[in-house]
Amino acid sequence: MNILANDGIHPAGQKALEAAGHNLWTEFIEPQSLAAFINDNAIDGLLVRSATKVREPLIDACPNLGFIIRGGVGMDNIDVAYARDHGKEVRNTPAASSQSVAELVMGHLFALSRSLHDSNRRMPVEGVEQFKALKKSYGKGRELRGMTLAIVGFGRIGQSLAQYALGCGMNVIGVDQQSGVKRIDLAIGNQSVSVEVPVMTLHEALPLADAISLHIPAQADGKAVIGSMEMGKMKKGVILLNAARGGVVDEDALLEALDSGQVSGAGVDVFVGEPKPRLDLMRHAGISLSPHIGAATGEAQERIGLEIASIVAEIGSK
């Protein structure tokens, strides 16, 4: 088959696809030229990550395109229902990046609990002259052990995050549409431990959590899941983490909550208006920042590439 990896693919995935006899293009084609490239080269499958948008006009313009695979989890850059209605198979790689995203969230959580995000900004500028003052300023850290983490969206990424948090001695609450109990397995050395985690609704969990992490897709109506009302129900001084999608958290409400102290700190990996996030978010001292890199590890990208190759093989066998 002829396959275009428009946002690139890990060498392991490229090797697997080419070894299976597929013709693979890996250059990035600009949006205005993408339909023509697909049609001129008889492309059967389009591989994308988050950069390439697959909207209705592109789908209409490429009637012979057979499948679209999103390397990653969220598919809000693809008009999935429309593509499927027009006979195109649409898949993603939901399991491949879970651990990498969870580790990034834990990195933000550690940074915020000890003000590392801000001290790393100020030490190069003020560290020599104001060392004692900075030491005093950042001397009110918190241990994660004993804190309660609510994980909103308790799928693969949420459960992977739960494993890390439980390993740090945190109490974990899962947030999903159906309440109940979920068993989380922890591998410690050669032993396995199973821990029961309560699962409840968002509004039940909000007042209980010391930290809240979001792992849900962008909403179909474009509205934020966490706005000023939800933040008002949280514990004062809560830590809020978003490595899901920009817009899931109302950015105006977040800034207000940070300024008032309702939210003590926020770890933000995703933004409205990417790749040009708003400047006041970038400069806020209460925010630990990263540029949408949840799945950006070599290990995750290798797994994504190999999972894509496996999906292509499955599609080709039908």
Where are these regions (language model features)?
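An N-terminal-biased, well-structured beta-alpha scaffold segment characteristic
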Residues: 1-90, 207, 227
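Conserved N-terminal Rossmann-fold NAD(P)-binding element of oxidoreductases
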Residues: 6, 150-153
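Short, Asp-centered acidic motifs that coordinate Mg2+ and/or phosphate
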Residues: 44-45, 67, 211, 239, ...
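Rossmann-like adenosine-cofactor binding region
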Residues: 54-59, 177-280
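Phosphate-coordination loops involved in phosphoryl transfer and adenosine-cofactor binding
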Residues: 65, 145-148, 228, 237
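Phosphate-binding beta-alpha-beta segment of Rossmann-like dinucleotide-binding domains, i.e.
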Residues: 86, 94-148
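Hydrophobic/small residue at the entry helix of a nucleotide-binding pocket
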Residues: 157
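Adenosine-phosphate binding glycine-rich loop
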Residues: 270, 275-278, 282-316
